[in-house]
Amino acid sequence: QNAVLQALAVLLHRKPKLLVFDVTPHEFVPFVIQSVAEWLGISVLFFQPCSMAPTMLARTNLRAVTSPKGAEVAASPIAREICAFMPQRLKLLIEGLDPKYIQQQRGRDETASSPFHLLKSVPATLSWLWKDRFPRSRDFTGHAGLDGVMGRLAKIILFRSLQSTLRGKVNSLGSRSLPLAPYCVLALHYEPERTSVPEGFPIDFQGDAVVHSRLLVPETNALVVKEHYSQQTSAMRGVAGRSPEFYDLVESMPNTWFAPTQSRLSELVSGAECVITLTGTVAIESVLRGVPVAYFGSPWWEGLPGTVRITDAFSYDDVRGLKLPDQGDVADFLDNLCSSPMIPGLAGESIETMEYRLGPLPQGFFDAVANSVSLCVRREMELT
């Protein structure tokens, strides 16, 4: 309530015509400000990143894309260099390889379990007795109020206990033999993150996604749920988005199974009758393997051939009746999407992270970003 009232007071005092966010508002304060602004009738502009190229969609809400003339990648002098990232990433999806960040997490988890690393981590752990590991605004452990040396010690112990319990539960998933065909796959997202909340709306709790999926899929079809590897990795705080009880809830549903968390999603997808996701790039992997996709949210790849958005009027026949593309169709769709309506940009991502995932950015990239963003802002200002 305080956050909403503060946002309301600031916006009423400042009276802006347009609010611009560098990325889809998903952290608490930006999300509240955006929601209050929309309620007041203030225009909003934000940028949704693409995971396969240094490009983004300019949006005025989760269901509306804006792309003024001259802002698209196609209008940039480095359009060819920017769009060249797409086929490189597409090749990895065709091969079914883990993305770089998952490979890095797997390697880090192996290292973190070694006695040498545990000994090496002692100084860092001791330092958290004197200074909180996470700032209060990002401490999602539920124990942010514990202060002092003893309070911080309790917080360290409690957090590690939560982390250990979750990891044990997640790594025990898939102990039952998976069902024979036919089955459908629901690929969960790491939570909390932008691609699930808010881009996965109207789903804001992935347990609801499981329930909806189970109701959509015929009773004779098994629903195989695949947890995201990142949810239990030592590098992330998966305890902020899941609890062991979540998995008990899912397993209590009829004809619903978990795949082993360590397994590759691409291998599971190949034998599925359909795949369901919020906004994940598993949709691209699936249609490349001849498997149709149903999705809930507002992904950057929306409109991909072989996919359909789940709405109130959706039925299972809608996904079964989809015409599936070949690899050339998928490549053409992504190339056209990259050219327009996408614009150059990182959408709040750091240069280091983007270059680690995709490779070096082309020369002149940030000039192209500045030009495109300024055109988008100017267009929205003219419309207000």
Language-model features: locations:
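A short helix->loop->beta-strand "cap" motif at the edges of active sites that frequently abuts
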Residues: 40-43, 221, 291
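Conserved nucleotide-sugar donor-binding subdomain of glycosyltransferases
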Residues: 1-27, 99, 103-160, 334, ...
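A donor-sugar binding/catalytic signature common to diverse glycosyltransferases
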Residues: 21-25, 260-307
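Structural alpha-helical scaffold elements that stabilize or flank donor/cofactor-binding regions
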Residues: 12, 177, 267-268
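Leloir-type glycosyltransferase catalytic cores
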Residues: 71-121, 305-384
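Nucleotide-activated donor-binding/catalytic signature segment of Leloir-type glycosyltransferases, i.e.
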Residues: 240-260
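Conserved catalytic-core segment of nucleotide-activated headgroup transferases in glycan assembly
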Residues: 127-243
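Active-site and donor-binding regions of nucleotide-sugar-utilizing enzymes
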Residues: 1-78
